Amino acid sequence: MSSSANSIKVVARFRPQNRVEIESGGQPIVTFQGPDTCTVDSKEAQGSFTFDRVFDMSCKQSDIFDFSIKPTVDDILNGYNGTVFAYGQTGAGKSYTMMGTSIDDPDGRGVIPRIVEQIFTSILSSAANIEYTVRVSYMEIYMERIRDLLAPQNDNLPVHEEKNRGVYVKGLLEIYVSSVQEVYEVMRRGGNARAVAATNMNQESSRSHSIFVITITQKNVETGSAKSGQLFLVDLAGSEKVGKTGASGQTLEEAKKINKSLSALGMVINALTDGKSSHVPYRDSKLTRILQESLGGNSRTTLIINCSPSSYNDAETLSTLRFGMRAKSIKNKAKVNAELSPAELKQMLAKAKTQITSFENYIVNLESEVQVWRGGETVPKEKWVPPLELAITPSKSASTTARPSTPSRLLPESRAETPAISDRAGTPSLPLDKDEREEFLRRENELQDQIAEKESIAAAAERQLRETKEELIALKDHDSKLGKENERLISESNEFKMQLERLAFENKEAQITIDGLKDANSELTAELDEVKQQMLDMKMSAKETSAVLDEKEKKKAEKMAKMMAGFDLSGDVFSDNERAVADAIAQLDALFEISSAGDAIPPEDIKALREKLVETQGFVRQAELSSFSAASSDAEARKRAELEARLEALQQEHEELLSRNLTEADKEEVKALLAKSLSDKSAVQVELVEQLKADIALKNSETEHLKALVDDLQRRVKAGGAGVAMANGKTVQQQLAEFDVMKKSLMRDLQNRCERVVELEISLDETREQYNNVLRSSNNRAQQKKMAFLERNLEQLTQVQRQLVEQNSALKKEVAIAERKLMARNERIQSLESLLQESQEKMAQANHKFEVQLAAVKDRLEAAKAGSTRGLGTDAGLGGFSIGSRIAKPLRGGGDAVAGATATNPTIATLQQNPPENKRSSWFFQKS
């Protein structure tokens, strides 16, 4: 087995400035002086950095691979262990360098896809007598917990170290692959399960360190020799400055763990390079523990440091370059992991036996010489035993065979032990015995298993606690929603109650209004009945009045008959008086004719004519009296109309007084009004009596005047004689004609005036009767006092009766309102009871529904717990993946595959039967 000391290959790559740096005013601060040197000119420091190779912003993915990684693939196929990992701040392009934009993009794919393709290309182009098997595994270190990305349910795997296997992850799923596409499928599956998140520096920032492990075993089928090489492809999470990334919450916790593990990596590199440390802290972080062989051990390591050229990230760029400079000074001791063939073992055995025989002969010669010397004798110099000239050199058969390969389980002699001082710098200063070391490793593995078990239990408890908290939060949210819904329902119920109460109040008001209207209707009905009764009374009084009027008409007719007895026309145009006047005129004409004929007028005729003239004078006087009485009757009619108007006004005032409640002041006012009306009526009656007396005196004077006129006419007749009569015959005739016309008009008016006179006489009789009654009532003071006392008692009784009626009606109304309120309250109680029953039923339904949902959630939780426990405890949790993926798929060189090997992996689809939900996916893997 060959061993060679080599340094870590460090390659620096600078990406172009991104949008954030340009918007922040960043300027390029890096200049490239050659293919391996760059100069940084920043505010903090200036200087040049030299690495194995420096790539500027315009480099391609293929340039990185051809210079940096392609030799590493050849070393893996030659039986060496190899490591390629990218280091740098977040957003510096590590994942882009390792994975690229897409696996299927020939130009944009990164280092890992190109390595896979190069491996299978080299296998197919190798010799036909070499048989290869390729295994891959994919894991991430998230929050200092190792998680299998191909079996995400295994999220807390322990790190073990054994003498034969070295450092490895226990329980990590390894999949046999036979083609590039199968490896790509595994990478896609694992990449989808990887944790990523968005920060201010990167939209899809890796929140974990991912490690993709490729193990290649090769065997020479002719000689039986074997080699194995293991390649670690590490995509480190970027170091973060919280002020720039804006991390908070879970992202901040992830950043803390990332920076802690990167700090542990820096401490390991410092311990390996300072030359003073007696202890290398590999166990401070699971990342450094897994990469223990890659840092100062049995591995050929390539470090790609990714940097930003902008002044915005100058501090991070300087830190990354200094990290690369320190890592470059680490010395690894890579060895070929070889397994010897039987022929080589026989050859080594023969050589060992020859050496043993030589040693035994040499020992015998030395012992005999020593005995001589001890016996006090001297051995001649020429008889001294010569020094052993046999050169003990290790066999070089392993290095001379054509590309041998080691199996997965290495022999103790095939690898350097981890703590050996000669193999790695910084191992413990006190070496352990072989047995002590094995016991130490065994004890360490047990403790690691216990720690992993306890961490799994703690993680399960934390997960259960988190789920319980989430469930509690969900329940609280549900409770808050129910509370809000309850408050909303309560508010709606209160609104409905207010509306109901408002409607009830409006209903009560409407009912009270209806009751008031009913009362008003009853009052109006009573008033209507009273009005009807009054109408009946008025009809009765009208009948009585009509009877009185009939009696008055009868009296009027009788008086008219008496008054017009002397003027009865008996249906003709002229009455008896008119005919008498006409006869007198005719007789006067006859006498005029006799006198004109010259005949003597008989004295009897003159006497008869004189009597008729006297009678005619009476008629004239009567006509004048009738005319005067007509004028006086007009005045009396006007006065009567005024009296009737005053009487009607008094009656209206009396009705108004009766229609309202009378107080003592009202009573006094009524008494005053009655006294005033009586006094006014008495004054009117007295005035009327005086006027009638004056009329009588006037009539007497007129009668005397008429008598004087009659006497004068008589004298004139006597003095004039027949000559006068004959001279004035024609004039008298004309006067008689005029008198006849006037008489007709006077007779027409006479009848009307007689009617008025009769009416006035009747009214005068009634007034006299009323006046007499007033006089009688005014004279009876005792009776008036008694009537006043009775009226007061009647008024008091009426008032008390009215108050009692009002109180009774008010009490009836209050009783009716109270009954309605009681009925409304009972109805409201019944409605509230029904609403309470409905709400209780709804609450019971909601509780039942919630219990069903809670039971379903608990069932799903138990099922998830049972499924995760089955996935961790048995291989059945891996599905068909654990069966097909663990079947070796040997590959032959020369472009031919071993019979039975397939180009596809049908068990990949069953790798993750229950893919985790809400996992952040990587932008490097585009599902095809």
From Swiss-Prot:
Record field: transmembrane: none
GO terms for MF: ATP binding; ATP hydrolysis activity; microtubule binding; microtubule lateral binding; plus-end-directed microtubule motor activity
Biased composition (Low complexity): 395-409
Subcellular location: Cytoplasm, Cytoskeleton
Gene3D superfamilies: Kinesin motor domain
PROSITE patterns xref list: KINESIN_MOTOR_1, KINESIN_MOTOR_2
Region Disordered, annotated ranges: 395-434, 893-928
Keyword terms, alphabetized: ATP-binding, Coiled coil, Cytoplasm, Cytoskeleton, Microtubule, Motor protein, Nucleotide-binding
Domain Kinesin motor: 7-330
GO cellular component: cytoplasm; kinesin complex; microtubule; microtubule cytoskeleton
Top-level lineage group: Eukaryota
Biased composition range(s): Polar residues: 905-928
Domain comment (free text): Composed of three structural domains: a large globular N-terminal domain which is responsible for the motor activity of kinesin (it hydrolyzes ATP and binds microtubule), a central alpha-helical coiled coil domain that mediates the heavy chain dimerization; and a small globular C-terminal domain which interacts with other proteins (such as the kinesin light chains), vesicles and membranous organelles.
Family according to the record: Belongs to the TRAFAC class myosin-kinesin ATPase superfamily. Kinesin family. Kinesin subfamily.
Task performed by this protein: Kinesin is a microtubule-associated force-producing protein that may play a role in organelle transport. Its motor activity is directed toward the microtubule's plus end.
Name listed for the protein in its UniProt record: Kinesin heavy chain
Organism: Neurospora crassa (strain ATCC 24698 / 74-OR23-1A / CBS 708.71 / DSM 1257 / FGSC 987)
